[in-house]
């Protein structure tokens, strides 16, 4: 069992959880993720590592309640059954930051994508690199960790669907006019957002890295649930990724696979809600 220090709501439908997991944070490099199990019989939830304290052995995650497993996790108070990680490959820029010191870098974060973007930007800032960020959300109240992000970025621009903060529109509306100013782009967020970012950056011949978030089960590549088509070849997000060249991803197939079990997931989510409410009483 792993001790939970807190599990708090940070926006509508999103939570931040802090867990004591010294072995997980010991060797982590931003861009990696972990699998979290709320209980012994729970499904494994792949969560990007949002922050970590290697001295105290604490790992932090921000997650959105989008199904039965994350609904169950949102009710956790004192401990979780398992935390496995770090998994996946580190971010290319963080791993080889010396090679990017003279490059102009822009990160594009959508919604909860701000969580995995933050440790990468902070890591690069701590190693002397200046990074710009474009952050988007449906509305101002859903923009995560603004204060923390603003301390480590060179420049940050915001976009909200309803215009309540920053540019009214999407992150691509902000990116398109300035894309030629950069040498590399990293996009993290909903699948459709990453696809539209790649559509824009391809026009500008701007190299783009995306962090794929497909269905995932075991985190070892054995189950094949997280398979993606990259440059026409099968890759597994859990071991080869989660980051890939965005211009080589088959997003149509990726989004189709994401929706494969949508009805079953909704039914299971409804059952989980009823069970948790019953246990609460």
Regions found by a protein language model. Give the residues of each.
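Short, Lys/Arg- and Gly-enriched loop/turn segments at beta-strand edges
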Residues: 42-49, 88-97, 238
């Amino acid at each position: 069992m792993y001790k939970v220090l807190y599990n708090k709501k940070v926006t509508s439908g999103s939570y931040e959880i802090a867990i004591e997991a010294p072995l997980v944070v010991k060797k982590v490099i931003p861009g990696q993720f972990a699998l979290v199990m709320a209980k012994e019989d729970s499904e494994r939830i792949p969560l990007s590592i949002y922050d970590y304290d290697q001295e105290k052995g604490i790992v932090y995650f921000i997650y959105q309640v989008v199904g039965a497993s994350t609904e169950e996790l949102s009710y956790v108070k004192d401990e979780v059954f398992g935390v496995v990680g770090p998994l996946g490959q580190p971010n290319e820029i963080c791993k080889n930051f010396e090679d990017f010191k003279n490059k102009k870098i822009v990160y594009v974060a959508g919604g909860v994508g701000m969580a995995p973007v933050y440790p990468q930007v902070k890591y690069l800032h701590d190693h002397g690199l200046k990074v710009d960020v474009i952050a988007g959300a449906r509305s101002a109240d859903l923009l995560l960790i603004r204060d923390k992000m603003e301390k480590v970025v060179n420049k940050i621009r915001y976009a909200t669907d309803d215009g309540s903060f920053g540019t009214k529109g999407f992150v691509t509306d902000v990116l398109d006019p300035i894309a030629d100013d950069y040498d590399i782009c990293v996009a993290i967020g909903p699948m459709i957002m990453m696809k539209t970012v790649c559509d824009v950056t391809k026009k500008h011949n701007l190299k783009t890295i995306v962090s794929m978030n497909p269905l995932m089960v075991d985190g070892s590549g054995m189950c094949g649930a997280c398979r993606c088509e990259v440059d026409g070849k099968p890759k597994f997000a859990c071991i080869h990724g989660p980051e890939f060249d965005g211009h080589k991803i088959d997003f149509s197939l990726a989004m189709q696979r994401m929706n494969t079990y949508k009805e079953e997931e909704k039914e299971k989510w409804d059952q989980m809600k009823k069970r948790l409410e019953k246990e609460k009483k």
